[in-house]
Structures are given as C-alpha cells and as structure tokens.
Swiss-Prot record:
It comes from Pastinaca sativa. Pfam families: p450. This is Xanthotoxol synthase. It comes from the Eukaryota. Gene3D superfamilies: Cytochrome P450. One of its GO terms (cellular component) is membrane. The chain crosses the membrane at residues 3-23.
Amino acid sequence: MDPAAIFLILAIPIASVYLLFYHKKRVNGLSSPPGPRGLPFIGHFYQIYKSECAHEYISNLSKQYGSLMTLHLGSVPALVVSSPKMAQEVLKTQDLVFCSRAQMTGSGKLSYNGLEMAFAPYGEHWRNVRKMCTLELFTQKRAQFNFRPVREDEVSRMVGRLSEAAAASEDVNAYECFTNFATSIISRVAFGKRYDEDNLGKEKFQRMVADIEAMFAAFFVSDFFPMFGWIDRLSGVKAVLDRNFNEMDTFYQELIDEHLKPDRPESLNGDLIDVMLKNKGSFLTMDSIKAILLNVFSGGIGTTGSALVFAMTALLRNQRVMKKAQEEVRSVIGKKEIVDEDDIQKLPYLRAVVKETLRLYPPGPLLIPRVAMESCVLGEDEDHMYMIKPNTIVYVNTWGIGRDPKYWKNPLEFMPERFFERPDLNYTGQQFEYLPFGSGRRICAGIIIGQNNVEVGLANLLYSFDWEPPTGKTFEDIDDQPCNGLTLAKKNPLYIRPKIYVHP
C-alpha cells in the first residue's frame, strides 16, 4: 500500500489534537514568508501529494503568495523561491547559508550517506570531492579526449538505428532512443564498457538506473513525519530501497573489482573509475567512488534523455522553429557523415534551441533542494523582510521563473530568437532568471559534458532526418505535459517517425 495513503489515514486524529495547541510564532519580530493555509500537523503535504504535477502546483501557488512562499511538509518547514532577485540572494549572496542538503532517506541511502557531490551535506568531504571532480573528472581536457570520441561514435550508432527504423517506416520511442544514446556514452566513459541494445546486461543496467531514479523521487514518511517512520517498513518502500541499494552496490563493486585486476588492459586516457582509483586516499574511499558513480549515472543519463525528448517535442509542436533549425544545420554542415563538436560552434540557432528548451523545460524544475544551515533574513525590500529558520528546505522554482512574464516576453511561446537579444544568458548561473543547471557552490559540475551531449545529439537528429508524428497522429496531438520527479520527464511517451533526409 502507498505509504502516503497509510499515513494520511492515521494522521487525521492527531491533526485534530494538534490544532488545539498550535500557535504560530514570530522570531525576532519577523514572521515566516506568506503561504497557503495548511492542515494541522500535516501542513501542505496532502495538497502536494494529490497534485498531478507537484512543481506546477507549487509554481501556481507562488503566483498568489509571492517570490518567497512558506510551505509546511509535515514537521519540515519549506521555502519556495520564485524570483531572480531572491534566487540570487539564496544561491549567491547568502550561498554559504543555503549550500547544504537535507538528509533524506532515499538520497541518503543511495549516496552512501552523502559521500558524493549532489546530495552530500556541505563540509570538508564535499569540498574535497567537488575539487577532485572539477580538476580530474569533468575537465575540458577530459571532455575533449574521453567524451568526444565516444560521443561521436555513439551518435553514428544512434543515426544508424534511426535509419533502420526509417527504412522500415517504424515509430520510435524517443525517450528509449535518447537514453540508449546517453547510457552508452556514460557507461563507456565511466567504466570502459558498452552494453549493446540486445544485451541482457544493458537491460539490467537501465532498469537499475530507472529504479534508482524512482527511489530519489519516492516518498518516505520518516523524512517529514519521523514518529511515523515505521510506515516505511509496513508499506514495503524501505525494503524496495534496500533491495535497489544492494543491487547497485553489487554492480559498482563488480566494476571496481574488474578495474583492480592486474592483467586488465588500461585505456589510453583511463576511464572515470581508473581516475578515481588513482586518487583513492583519505577522503576518497571505495564507498565514495561508488557514490560518485551514482552522480555520473543519475545525472548524465536521465537528464540528457529528457532534454532531447523535450527539445524534439517543442520542435514538433513548432514547425517554424524546426524548419529554421534544420535549414541552418544542413546549410552550414553540407555533406558529412555526422555533425561533430567543432560544427556546433557554427550553429547559433541550434544552440539557441537548446537554451530555449532548458528555459521552458528545466532539468530540475525546483533544483535539488537546499537546506538553511542557520537562521537568516530574506526579502524583496525593506517592507517585506522575513525570518528563515534553520533546517528549512529551500526549493528554487526554476520552472516558474522561466515562465514568468515579468522576465520573459510571451513566456509560453517556444522562441529561440529571444537568446540572440540576450547573449549574456548562458549556463553559468550568473543570470538568475535563467538557471537550468543551478548556481553558486552547488552548480552542476558536469555542465560542459551535458551541454555537448544534448547539442551534438540534437544537431544530428535534425541533420540526418525529417520527422513526422507517429501513425494516426498529427503534430497538434503531441503534448508537453510533464510528470512528477526530481528530474523533469514527459508524462506521455513521445513517439516519432524518422524519414531519412537525402542531402542534395
């Protein structure tokens, strides 16, 4: 049974008693930011739980309550930040106050109690891991010599598979196609092994990654209502988490054991496991290596696949933009087997298409939540200052900011041209109306790699193929409805039909 449903049944009588004794308190004369009225004890948990898409629901609430909005998720206070000015305050000006992570059951278990980058609490271990990843794993040099040749090979393979589907007049599941592409890149670069599409090992690997993503998004009662933590065991969700963790741990250990074999031939530049084993020491333990592999897989596969799905969704729904992007890539590239990274620099409209995709469909619609390490004061102006308590979870509403008409003209229109008017808008997190990869100390470490995967992948999709809706559908039938999850994903699968483009 759903753990949330069990909890709601049990919580109603407790909420009634709680209402008799609860009084809202002000701290140092300042109150918390405004927010919708929640249920006693439960807070706003029920409203968010029953919403079809949590980030859309939260974003709509913020339109009513403002750029700083308080929610109560059971016993946990939460702050939703929905303006560039307040995002800058949280992610830059007071970054040191807000740069830690809440320790949640799912992410805590899967990250080996925070031994990696994305979910680790702020501290010396996180700084050491971040430094090692920045200087060793995700460098421009490694992107050039490790990722690039693998990416170009996988692009050729993807184009070949799509050509076969086109010859057979078959519809293609876009997410499966694009995650196969991303999975092959990440697996080859991370541990030097490729899983073929018909190989049982790849099916197991992709299922494991999907199960891990589901656990990151899963609801654990103990995170928000500690006294009811036993419900996680009763519902079975804790057992599922333990099973997924054990499967993941065994998989990582087998990979590491293979790399430790003395007779194993080492690649010219070394894969990511090779690099980490060479740096193994006081802070980088075997569990740390496994935890960082989790970051690489979870951050590099689903996000790339979803970004390409939403890019193709937007282009299919906007044929003017599709044709303009195809004309650019085909006229600039001429006749080549594939579009490579050097070509991307000559395709400003294609790059604007990717930027516009990440504005409308940010990979993390609420970013990975941060947590306030101490009390602080936030406010848009002197008349609207609020006290933020320690241990408040902070969600930066990139979904809402990217669709706010105060900052974007015709925000719901897919219009890549807007980025020619604002060339300063990029992925570095310095313009706070545009934060697809976050900002500050916790900005995504793999921006360059993710950007290259999406740009090169999309360029080749537009260069080699024309695209039609699936059998029996029209372009107008294609929706862009998202679903719940830590990473943005499309609710309804996108099926598309490729047609080989014959270059004149």
